[in-house]
């Protein structure tokens, strides 16, 4: 019984680390966190995250149920702490996709540009905002600039 209690306590501690905000990660100088689940007496790793000194998530590894790596994301940030680049790798650490994020003068996300493993543009997300800075639309285009989808955002304020 003590062993089960200890395992549950460890899992809860790991979940609480993973669930921490960027501010808390920085404040407590957390360098890494891991999330695992115990199913039918077997411990299954779900994810591992590495943070920089500013609390930014710089590497995230997701695992399959059998414990093998599913995918890895490596992320870079600008001086304001905004994500500017995310590289995705497969289970064999082979580069799959790169996402570049751009921001407008107000610091709002304006574009996400996706490239495949050979550097070819695959799609773009283009964001628009209203006068209050609220996101109103996300337009997705293919490599040729053809609109694939439009996502509208509506806010109820009263």
Predicted regions and their residues:
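Buried hydrophobic residues that stabilize the cores of well-folded domains
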Residues: 20-158
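Bacterial Sec-dependent N-terminal signal peptides
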Residues: 1-23
